[in-house]
């Protein structure tokens, strides 16, 4: 029997044109939008109210389906400027999206197309018209789910086959996905954040040189780094420490990215450890944070439901200050496995999980959350200044 999560819909659907099929056999039906087709992925939920374009194009969401808890998604349309993946024309990011309400006509002066058209162009399959908060409760109680999302305009689905695909999908554990999203070659970055009536700015002043290792980097991270008057060189994930050192960087940034950090660590750890040994200032975000922790000997674990949203409280254990931050991760650093020379600096006030570390006696630190937000609050923008201050102080000493 088909189990459904129903919702009061603002339209009449005689034949469902999209399905979400979970590995436990649950089938959820609704109206399709965006691309047609079938995709297997991990199902998670995001509690952000705004920034759906940035969320869906974040490479960290590779092989994931995002269930939005906020009911009205798509009201401001879409454009080609707010994409977070480094290569805008690529389809890096989520493979599926789930909305409670139908996609409306856009109402925003920056919109160039409606969300349905944008989803279709980016090959993202969408399901509309279900109770996304009931689905969120399911994820909260049972954990992230392996699932299949399918969209067929004629409403014909082979449900037994979809159930088998959901059950057989391998999941994200032991999966290195940086291969799919990293830059194919090195690039120089100079774009700064968007400003009212001016658009995106350009940084022409280079007081220091930062090499950013791209494990699936977001554009707004690079923009905020550029505001620190830094020359930024983005390099592919497999770039060796020898190649990075030959670029004579003043500091190295370890980016966010998708997949299991333990899988990516197989080739990332030797590079990171060599850079640490050379006493270079290092700053990591999200996956970069996890890779740094693995490099110093800690372990990472798969989370029950992950943290995905723009309203997460994080406590700085040194100052006692609480910041509201954006998060997007399904793995976490096990703080109990941190070695003695590594200090835990931040924790989540939702579940106490690790959110930051620093290596004692070295200019090296990282955070689990996203200080660049996009979308989200700006409480942690100062970390980019902190990183560059570390670099400048290190240059004075050395």
Swiss-Prot record:
The gene is carA. Small subunit of the glutamine-dependent carbamoyl phosphate synthetase (CPSase). CPSase catalyzes the formation of carbamoyl phosphate from the ammonia moiety of glutamine, carbonate, and phosphate donated by ATP, constituting the first step of 2 biosynthetic pathways, one leading to arginine and/or urea and the other to pyrimidine nucleotides. The small subunit (glutamine amidotransferase) binds and cleaves glutamine to supply the large subunit with the substrate ammonia. Its EC number is 6.3.5.5. Composed of two chains; the small (or glutamine) chain promotes the hydrolysis of glutamine to ammonia, which is used by the large (or ammonia) chain to synthesize carbamoyl phosphate. Tetramer of heterodimers (alpha,beta)4. The active site is at residues 286, 370, 372. L-glutamine binds at residues 60, 257, 259, 287, 290, 328, 330-331. Residues 1-207 are annotated as: CPSase. GO terms for molecular function: ATP binding; carbamoyl-phosphate synthase (glutamine-hydrolyzing) activity; glutaminase activity. Coiled coil: none annotated. Keywords: Amino-acid biosynthesis, Arginine biosynthesis, ATP-binding, Glutamine amidotransferase, Ligase, Nucleotide-binding, Pyrimidine biosynthesis. HAMAP family: CPSase_S_chain (MF_01209). This is Carbamoyl phosphate synthase small chain. The keyword Manganese does not apply. Residues 209-397 form the Glutamine amidotransferase type-1 domain. It catalyses: hydrogencarbonate + L-glutamine + 2 ATP + H2O = carbamoyl phosphate + L-glutamate + 2 ADP + phosphate + 2 H(+). It is an enzyme of class 6 (ligase). GO terms for biological process: 'de novo' pyrimidine nucleobase biosynthetic process; 'de novo' UMP biosynthetic process; glutamine metabolic process; L-arginine biosynthetic process. Belongs to the CarA family. SMART domains: CPSase_sm_chain.
């Amino acid at each position: 029997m088909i189990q459904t999560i129903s919702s009061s819909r603002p339209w009449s659907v005689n034949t469902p044109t999209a399905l979400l099929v979970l590995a436990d056999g649950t089938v959820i039906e609704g109206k399709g939008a965006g691309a047609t087709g079938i995709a297997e992925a991990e199902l998670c939920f995001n509690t952000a109210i705004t920034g759906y374009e940035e969320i869906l194009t974040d490479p960290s969401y590779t092989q994931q389906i995002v269930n939005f808890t906020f009911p009205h998604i798509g009201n401001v349309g879409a454009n080609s400027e707010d994409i977070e993946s480094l290569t805008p024309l690529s389809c890096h990011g989520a493979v599926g999206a789930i909305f409670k309400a139908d996609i409306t006509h856009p109402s925003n002066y920056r919109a160039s197309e409606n969300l349905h058209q944008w989803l279709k162009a980016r090959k993202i399959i969408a399901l509309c018209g279900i109770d996304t908060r009931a689905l969120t409760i399911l994820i909260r109680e049972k954990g992230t789910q392996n699932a299949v999302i399918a969209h067929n305009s004629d409403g014909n689905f082979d449900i037994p086959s979809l159930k088998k695909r959901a059950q057989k999908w391998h999941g994200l554990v032991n999966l290195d996905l940086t291969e799919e999203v990293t830059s194919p070659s090195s690039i120089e970055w100079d774009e700064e954040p968007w400003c009212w009536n001016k658009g995106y700015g350009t940084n022409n002043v280079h007081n220091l040189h930062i090499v950013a290792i791209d494990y699936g980097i977001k554009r707004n991270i690079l923009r905020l780094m550029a505001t620190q008057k830094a020359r930024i060189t983005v390099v592919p994930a497999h770039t060796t420490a020898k190649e990075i050192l030959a670029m004579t960087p003043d500091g190295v940034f370890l980016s966010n990215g998708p997949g299991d950090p333990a899988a990516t660590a197989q080739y990332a750890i030797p590079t990171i450890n060599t850079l640490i040994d050379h006493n270079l200032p290092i700053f990591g975000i999200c996956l970069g944070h996890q890779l740094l922790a693995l490099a110093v000997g800690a372990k990472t674990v798969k989370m029950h439901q992950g943290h995905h949203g723009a309203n997460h409280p994080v406590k700085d254990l040194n100052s006692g200050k609480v910041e509201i931050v954006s998060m997007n991760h399904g793995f976490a650093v096990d703080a109990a496995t941190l070695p003695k020379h590594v200090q835990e600096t931040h924790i989540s006030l939702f579940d106490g999980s690790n959110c930051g570390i620093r290596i004692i006696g070295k200019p090296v630190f990282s955070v689990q959350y996203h200080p660049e937000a996009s979308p989200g609050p700006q409480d942690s923008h100062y970390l980019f200044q902190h990183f560059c201050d570390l670099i400048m102080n290190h240059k004075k000493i050395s």
